[in-house]
């Protein structure tokens, strides 16, 4: 037995097409061709039989057509004048070209590729011009081991003609009527009983055809249209239907090393190396025959593949999903789709154990481990592991959106985005969470949601170690470290690090408040504000301080509160260096330096430096007192006044003077007291220059100059500048002792 001594290379399994042949393939078939070629190349790389990337693969991955022009240039000058003479000779001999006829070029090419994949098991060698076979012999062409074949003139014409359709023979010129020396002898690994087996079968007027470099023999009758394909490997017989089928498959990694056949049909026990062979075999059970053999009982080897190809060309959908009703033109596409419903993921990554429902998805995943990104964007230099990802990315620069929604006309850069968008109109939510039953219209949303149950946060910041459940959140967070603010407001020029923050900011200019409370009707520009507001009505306070146990209805309030315990004051005033724990406090403080009072009361025209001060002041006019003491029921217009009042009931005095030990119930009282020790008098009268340590004393003194007497006696209507003076005066009417 002659063994194949050299390692299989990509050239051995590559199949190229001419312009004419590619014109017969629709988009689905062209995609299938590309996938098969790329899969063969990756399998060779994985087993170490290919150390470089051929130009053909690079061109296929970039979906370019330059390679077709090159092949046309290489072969065009040899196939012009010769074709007419060869076709005349072939028709005279009663032969037909099956490359573009009943047997499609696609089926022949795939069969050639599958046979080349197994060429490591036997060596094919052709030499010489003389043969022991007559032009017409009386037996099926089952060639035995060690037999020589001489190709006659008609045979040579056919061989040369087949060479025009097959791109396996590249850059070789074969004159009409001649066969290269490398073809003249064929050594096949079969039994030595060839002559006996040929003589025992009574089939007349058969002519042998052989394809270059491949041990495939087809017998075409002068009187019938039967197509019988002979090959070195014996035809596999189906026990249920009795028909013979061919294994037509690309090179796979498993079949090279183990010979394992993992794809088995439901109708019979026949097993195959790949799914495409299984799909072709299943057509036999469906009773599909080649048009060339429609008048006979016997099926041809390729008959199962022809109806599938015809349905793809015509766009007819013959296979339907019982789960969702989606239609497909090929049963293989239906089976792949059904894994969406069953959850089956037969393709597993050996590096990380992740599984996929399609082999193409596994190949796309593998570069994640290698880190290889050979495809670079010419515009921004960004790298990608797949050419398809690069093509999709390029649409960001070109603005191309080729996928349009027929309902609303919205455009998308990716088909998957369009499909997900269409579910908005249909309301379809096919993806269901197994833990809580929640349904989603997009699989990515389901995967993201599942991290809520698993608490998985796979995306980690290299700078601070913070983890995120979404890659998008990580990218947004990283801008905190880089200071990048790619989103600019055209109105005010303000920059933002995230698109969501930018969109929320734009509502400041537009005044849009899309989030409205159903209870009180109040509107909000951001959903987070709206959700926090709703807790005012529900009383929910889900955020708890771990130090003191205090609860808050908003996470931001909790973060601000925690700085009370840590003493952190990240917001510094550039004028005086004073620190603040909250940004709002810093903004309020800065008005002290600028003197700005942008908030104006519409009732009395009084102005304030802070919005909170304006809101507190407006309650003077409305009489609103929303802050009520739970102990005595007394109400106050300001929260700070309520907090001071509550100390009366508790007797608590948490603020202590370190100089004299005196305690105070309010921090302002402690601050005013400390000026007794320091002698500080920050409040100075501009009229007389007198200084005061407390603001209340300063305000009282100013009434001396203004003549204001706001405290009026209810009995005699006499006015006083100080409350204490009024209280002293009232004793005159009550008869109290001085």
UniProtKB/Swiss-Prot annotation:
Q: Which Gene3D superfamilies match?
A: 6.10.140.140, Classic Zinc Finger
Domain (KRAB) ranges: 8-79
Q: Where are the C2H2-type-classified zinc fingers? A: 263-285, 319-341, 347-369, 375-397, 403-425, 431-453, 459-481, 487-509, 515-537, 543-565, 571-593, 599-621, 627-649, 655-677, 683-705, 711-733
Q: Where in the cell is it found?
A: Nucleus
Q: Give any GO molecular function from the UniProt entry.
A: zinc ion binding
Ordered alphabetically, the record's keywords are: DNA-binding, Metal-binding, Nucleus, Repeat, Transcription, Transcription regulation, Zinc, Zinc-finger
Q: Which residues form a coiled coil?
A: none
At the top level of its lineage, which domain of life is listed?
A: Eukaryota
Q: Which Pfam families match?
A: KRAB, zf-C2H2
Q: Main localisation, per the record? A: nucleus
Q: Which InterPro entries match?
A: Ikaros_C2H2-ZF (IPR050589), KRAB (IPR001909), KRAB_dom_sf (IPR036051), Znf_C2H2_sf (IPR036236), Znf_C2H2_type (IPR013087)
Report one GO cellular component.
nucleus
Q: Per its database record, what is this protein's job?
A: May be involved in transcriptional regulation.
- Give the similarity note: Belongs to the krueppel C2H2-type zinc-finger protein family.
Q: What is this protein called?
A: Zinc finger protein 235
Specify the species: Homo sapiens (Human)
Q: What is the lineage of its organism?
A: Eukaryota, Metazoa, Chordata, Craniata, Vertebrata
């Amino acid at each position: 037995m002659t063994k194949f001594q050299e390692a299989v290379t990509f050239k051995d399994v590559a199949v190229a097409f001419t312009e004419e042949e590619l014109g017969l393939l629709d988009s689905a078939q062209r995609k299938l061709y590309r996938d098969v070629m790329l899969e063969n190349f990756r399998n060779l790389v994985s087993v170490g039989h290919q150390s470089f990337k051929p130009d053909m693969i690079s061109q296929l991955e970039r979906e370019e057509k330059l390679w077709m022009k090159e092949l046309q240039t290489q072969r065009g000058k040899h196939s012009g004048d010769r074709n007419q003479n060869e076709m005349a000779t072939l028709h005279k001999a009663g032969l037909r070209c099956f490359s573009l006829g009943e047997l499609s070029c696609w089926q022949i090419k795939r069969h050639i590729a599958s046979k080349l994949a197994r060429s490591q098991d036997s060596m094919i060698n052709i030499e010489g011009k003389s043969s022991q076979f007559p032009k017409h012999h009386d037996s099926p062409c089952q060639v035995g081991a060690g037999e020589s074949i001489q190709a006659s003139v008609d045979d040579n014409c056919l061989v040369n003609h087949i060479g025009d359709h097959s791109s396996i023979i590249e850059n070789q010129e074969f004159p009409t009527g001649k066969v290269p020396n490398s073809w003249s002898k064929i050594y096949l690994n079969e039994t030595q009983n060839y002559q006996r087996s040929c003589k025992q079968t009574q089939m007349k007027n058969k002519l042998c055809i052989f394809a270059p470099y491949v041990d495939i023999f087809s017998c075409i009758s002068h009187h019938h249209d039967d197509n019988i394909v002979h090959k070195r490997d014996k035809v596999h017989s189906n026990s249920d239907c009795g028909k013979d089928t061919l294994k037509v498959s690309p090179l796979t990694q498993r079949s090279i090393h183990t010979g394992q056949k993992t794809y088995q049909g439901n109708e019979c026990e026949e097993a195959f190396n790949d799914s495409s062979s299984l799909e072709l075999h299943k057509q036999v059970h469906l009773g599909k025959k080649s048009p060339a053999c429609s008048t006979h009982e016997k099926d041809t080897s390729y008959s199962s593949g022809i109806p599938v190809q015809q349905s793809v060309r015509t766009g007819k959908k013959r296979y339907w999903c019982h789960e969702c009703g989606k239609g497909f033109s090929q049963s293989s596409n239906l089976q792949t789709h059904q894994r969406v419903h069953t959850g089956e993921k037969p393709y597993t990554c050996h590096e990380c154990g992740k599984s996929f429902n399609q082999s193409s998805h596994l190949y796309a995943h593998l570069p994640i481990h290698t880190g290889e990104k050979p495809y670079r964007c010419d515009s921004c230099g960004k790298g990608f592991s797949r050419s398809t990802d690069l093509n999709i990315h390029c649409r960001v620069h070109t603005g191309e959106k080729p996928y349009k929604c027929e309902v609303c006309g919205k455009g998308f850069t990716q088909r998957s985005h369009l499909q997900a968008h269409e579910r908005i109109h249909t309301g379809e939510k096919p993806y269901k969470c197994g833990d809580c039953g929640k349904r989603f219209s997009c699989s990515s949303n389901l995967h993201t949601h599942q991290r809520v149950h698993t608490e998985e946060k796979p995306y980690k910041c290299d700078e601070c170690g913070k983890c995120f459940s979404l890659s998008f959140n990580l990218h947004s967070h990283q801008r905190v470290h880089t200071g990048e603010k790619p989103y600019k407001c055209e109105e005010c020029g303000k920059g933002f690090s995230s698109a969501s923050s930018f969109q929320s900011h734009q509502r400041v200019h537009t005044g849009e408040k899309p989030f409205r409370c159903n209870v009180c009707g109040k509107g909000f520009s951001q959903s987070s504000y709206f959700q926090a507001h709703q807790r005012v009505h529900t009383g929910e306070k889900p955020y708890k301080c771990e130090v003191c146990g205090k609860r808050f209805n908003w996470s931001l309030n909790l973060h601000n509160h925690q700085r009370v315990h840590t003493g952190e004051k990240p917001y510094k005033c550039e004028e005086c260096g004073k620190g603040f724990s909250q940004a709002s406090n810093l903004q309020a403080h800065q008005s002290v330096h600028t003197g700005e009072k942008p908030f104006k009361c519409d009732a009395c025209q009084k102005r304030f430096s802070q919005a909170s001060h304006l809101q507190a002041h407006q309650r003077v006019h409305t009489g609103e007192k929303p802050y009520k003491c739970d102990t005595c029921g007394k109400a106050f217009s300001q929260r700070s006044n309520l907090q001071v009042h509550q100390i009366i009931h508790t007797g608590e005095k948490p603020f202590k003077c370190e100089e004299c030990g005196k305690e105070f119930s309010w921090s302002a009282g402690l601050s005013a007291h400390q000026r007794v020790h320091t002698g500080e008098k920050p409040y100075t009268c501009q009229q007389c220059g007198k200084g005061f340590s407390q603001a209340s004393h300063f305000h009282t003194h100013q009434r001396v100059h203004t003549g204001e007497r706001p405290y009026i006696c209810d009995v005699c209507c006499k006015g006083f500048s100080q409350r204490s003076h009024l209280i002293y005066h009232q004793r005159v009417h009550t008869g109290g002792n001085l």
